[in-house]
Each structure stands twice: as structure tokens, then as C-alpha cells.
Amino acid sequence: MGLLQKLIKTYDVMADKYAGVYIDGMREPLAPVSHALQNAQIEITIDSNGCFIDAAAVPKKENRTLIPVSLKSANRTSHASPHPFAEQLEYLSGFDEERQKSYLEQLMDWDESAYGNVFTHAVHTYVEKNSIIHDLYKAEVLESENEEDMSKKKMQSTAYKKCLVRWKIKDVLTGEVIETWKSKEMFRCYIAYYNMVIAKESKTGLCMLTGENVPLTELHAKNIFPLQSGAKLVSANDKTEYTFRGTFVKNAEDLLTIGYEASQKSHNMLRWLLNNFGIIAGNEMFVYWNPNGRYVPSPFEDRKEGEEIISDRETLYRSIFESTEDSLSSTDCIVIAAFKAMTTGRLALAYYSETPGNDFVAKLEKWKESFTGAKWIPSIYMVSKYAYGSERNERIEIESGIYTKKIEELLWCKLYGHPISESLKNALVTKASSPYRAFHYRQQCSYNNCLWCSIQLCPL
């Protein structure tokens, strides 16, 4: 089973508990199928009859917003493909009549379907009034209501017309105010509606990830990699250049077909893992997990004797993956993967391994036991930095390519019992033997750490 299949399995396990749920300490929630995360600048409150109540600017620390998306809107560039619900002012204001018309038509189709609800009806009714810019100006959210200022003036470094609006709906009967970007009902209704749409609009065929005959897609998610926002993991829709041409097939569909739902689950799951639990090493990002949702001890970080939780990231990881190390068995696969943005639009899988859970834990214990009598075990980050890094401005810096290569090398040593290379040992011993050449005389801590790594990994 490959990476995308493992991600689909993980999504199926985690979605019921975490999809659409905002959790303190997390950078972002797990996006449900047919949803994406964007930054909202404006929050508008209307009642269930579509009457304006209030508006406010969204603080930057609270702006991550789950919004319904279509295949076209999620992959749009300059063409007018509106999001179905939360949208930018240029689609809502009426200054661009064509964009507003396409937004309202799409929203009406959802509202009039079996999956429409009070939220879709209220927003459609309100936007149709064409008063949103005036209301925002009166509420002092915008400094101007003139059309020419929509491109000139900015809010949070974003031009007015590009500001994303999210909706709060107040029930006129109960007075309850619903934040639609957190509403399970909204998620459920849109997923059901868009499944109906995709079944009509998309070609049905074999999904090579699940083995099922389902609606297929050639458009896949971007913005899944924190170090390069536009990079795609599955990206080639080019049928004229260097893609599948020259292989044993003549058509792209003969080489790879992926179901819409499988694509959504795998990409949303990968984004969630990378953004919340990813570990940056040079120009790559590593992530590790168990597809059954069990806790996995870190193969990267250092431990001190008696220390249980060593970082905020580890604390969050333990709270989400609720299990104990003892529960990992031979049937629990541990996945470790590293990703690298090759260009602004392309994401590569740079490292991938699968290890049985019981073997994974045993190898970590064996690595720990190899540090005889040690109260502190250096992390593979530290070993790499002190072996191949140089001190600059009182910091140990290492070239990105070397750093990631040595991290991967040490992972193989730690998890698969490979011997540590002589070149790495020699680098450590050389640094430890020449402290005045390798380290600034005031950086006693750096030298001590290097010496400790050398003693532990290069015994006489």
C-alpha cells in the first residue's frame, strides 16, 4: 500500500472525530471532503431571513476558515469560478456583475436542491440585495464604498475586492448565532450536494487508489505543503509536454486515474499532518504517523532521562493520537515520509518508509540502549548539525541538502539497524578534537554537545 492509500485510510479513521473541528494549539483543522482552508478577512452576521446585523474584521490569529469548494474554484487562477458559499468581495459586491451572477446561480442551485438549508437561503437572499459594500462601509469595516477603491485600499495587506467573507447566521426564532465555517450541518449538506454534482459532471471509472468504480478527477489539491503554498503532489494535467508521453500508454487516463473522494481524503489528510505535525529539516519536511490513529514515539527528537513530553508539538501529537506505545503491534504500520518542493508548483516525495509498529518501537529501544549509561540521548538533528555544520553568529548552521541527507541516513541507522557511516564518525571526531577551530571559544555549550555526540556514537 502506497502513500496516498495510507493517507486515505488515516482519513477514514480520523475524520469522524477531527474533520471540521478547530482545536486549541493546532495550526489548522482537518478539512472535510469538498472543503478547503483559506484566510478570511471579513466576518458578516445576518439573520436567517437574510437581513444584515453586523460585520467585523477577522483578527489574523483567528482567520483560518473552512469553506466549501468545487473542483474548479479550488483550482482557479484568474478565471471566474466562484466558491459556493464563503467568497471574496469581488464575487459578492455587484461591481463585477458577471462574477456576482455566477456566484448567485451556483448558490441558488445548492439552496434549491434537497441539500439546501437555512444558511444557504439566508446568504443568497442577502447577497441578492446588492448592499454588502454599503453595509461594510456603515459598519466601519471598509474605509470607502467607491468601486475604484476596491483595488487600491487594503485590509490586512489584501485588496478590498480580494477579502474573503465568512458568514454567521442568527436564527430569528431562537436567537442562536451559528458560525457556518464550524457547522457540522453545513459540512454534511455541502458534501452531499457536491457528491450529487460530481456524479453528474465527472467521468466514472476505476480509482487506482481504492479499486472502486467512482467519479474521477484530474484536478487535485494545492496548498498542502507549508514551505511552498502552491505546490501540488499530483499535478500533471499537461498532455503535450513531458508527462506520460514515451511510456507504454497513449492516454493519461491509461496511466493513472484517481477518484474525486480519494483525492480529497488523501490531500486533506496530508495537509493536516504536515501543517500540524510536520518537522522541518533543511528544505524538506518530515512527518510520521500510524494510519490507525495510534500514538507513535518520535524517531527524531532527543530525550532526557525521566522526561515524558519534550515539546509543544509532541504534547499536541499525544493529545490527538490517543494511545500508548505498548499498543503498537506487527499489524500497526508506522509511516515516515519527507516532502520537498521541487518548484513553486511541484511537490516531491523525497523519502518514504513503512515499518511494523512492534519492530519500530523495538528499534527505538535498541538505539536508546546503545547509549550506555547516558542520561541524555542526542537527536538525529543534533548529530547531523554538529558533524557537518559550522558556527555562524553564535549558531550552528548546516547546508540544507547535506542536512536532509544526513537526517535520512541516521533514520536508516536508527530504524533499520544500519551502521553509522565512517564519514559521519570522522566528522564528529574531527570537530570534537579541534574545538578552537570548530567553535567560538564562548560557545562552550556547542562544543560540549559535539563532544557528547562523538563519545556516544564513536566509542573507542
Model-inferred region functions:
Residues 1-193, 214-460:
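Extended alpha-helical scaffolding segments
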Residues 210-212:
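Short Cys/His-rich metal-coordination motifs, predominantly Zn2+-binding knuckles/fingers
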Residues 205:
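Cys/His-enriched microdomains
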